[in-house]
Amino acid sequence: MRTIRIGSGAGYSGDRIEPAVELAEKGDIQYLVFECLGERTVALAQQARMKDPDAGFDPLLEERMRAVLRLCAAKGIKIVTNMGAANPVAAARKTAEIAKSLGLSSLKIAAVIGDDVLDDCKDGDLRIMEFDGSIKQLGNRLLSANAYLGAAPMAEALSGGADIVITGRASDPALFLAPMIHAFGWAMDDWNLLGQGTVAGHLLECAGQITGGYFADPGYKDVADLARLGFPIGEVGEDGSLVITKVAGSGGAVTAQTCKEQLLYEVHDPKQYIQPDVVADFSQVKIEEIARDRVRVSGGRGTKRTDTLKVSVGYVDSYIGEGQISYAGPGALARGRLALEIVRERLKLTGVASSELRFELIGVDALHGAEVSAHANEPYEVRVRVAGRTENLREAVRIGNEVETLYTNGPAAGGGAFKSARDVVAVASVLLPRELARPQVRFVEA
């Protein structure tokens, strides 16, 4: 039975680069996938593209490509990535430019476009899933609308001879499913194979999470050599059989526990994990360790895909103003609390208009609140943080300014003040009839 090995080279935009190089050097892989596109990332990329039509792709695209292109070209490893973000064509052109500069003139690069459905959405009455409202009501605050594409156009690009496939918004598992469809000729209505392939993609998509990164918890779940964490490899058979592993000798661990945690990551209903290509069913998945750092995963199934695609909508929601300052030594906690009370009163006295305010001591009550931390030992040092949501930038700036004035206006011995004000790019979701997303493949020669 034919088997392919797919390496996961990144789990988010800013992920480490050397584990991907290790996969290309030592992983005996045929495909290297970089999953770099978070939910808000494409909206932020769209903002960048509005300022510069040649921008809008992943900021680390050049660094990643320069690190792996020679290796991948020499070994025949194909690259699949969503680093195209809001501008896959520009990303493909940039990659061709990089390849040429490295003396790799024969690489074939494909850009998958069609996820940008802003024009199809902005004047419609599509209902927002997270709150009561429609996309039309966002008005000029709307920045982007990108449909989650499936594996088919990426598989088409691979079948067309692409060495590198660059897409924008696509479902994360689809990046891994595409090589399986291409390599094995899976039918796009073989729901059980697509379901099992989606299990594989879901397990691999976050890179170092499944090899122990997100799993590690000292004293409870110890993982060795996290500074050299190896990224995962999926060995996939044409029948959908799957083994998760990593490069021998790399840091981290692949165990039944790490795989089970990742299987449940971001899953609301294990029986209906809705993807563009299939509704995957994880409920009968079986996970078993077969050797050190080798875990067999079976039992993924699927049913017919939906008639709609999820669309990630980016919009300017509000503004956030923030200020921080530190206190240390005897009485630090009391001084920190006094600082919060001073700022709270100052914001009232000066009439700062906000819709939401947070007053917290980092390391004391910032994460779980004052009730949970009430009985903890008093810390030697604290960091005051005040943040507020406002309707305009001017009011947001005033919040940080008030924290900064604690330097000279008390309490005693504050230091390391920081302030910022920024717009908040939020994301929401709508469902779009599938036929309104029209993916296309465009080839670029290096």
Describe the residue ranges of each PLM region.
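N-terminal glycine-rich anion-binding loops that anchor highly charged ligand groups
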Residues: 27-45, 70
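Active-site glycine-rich loop that binds ribose-phosphate moieties when present
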Residues: 144-158
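C-terminal non-catalytic interaction/assembly regions of soluble proteins
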Residues: 299-446
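Gly-rich Lys/Arg/Thr-decorated short loops/hinges at beta-loop-alpha junctions or inter-strand turns
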Residues: 1-2, 39-55, 73, 117-141
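Flexible, glycine/charged-enriched surface loops at secondary-structure junctions
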Residues: 105-109, 210-222, 270-289, 346-362, ...
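N-terminal amphipathic/basic leader segments beginning at the initiator methionine
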Residues: 1-22
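A conserved active-site cap/scaffold subdomain adjacent to cofactor or substrate pockets
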Residues: 194-299
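Catalytic or ion-translocation cores adjacent to nucleophile or general acid/base/metal-coordination motifs
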Residues: 100-117, 177-218
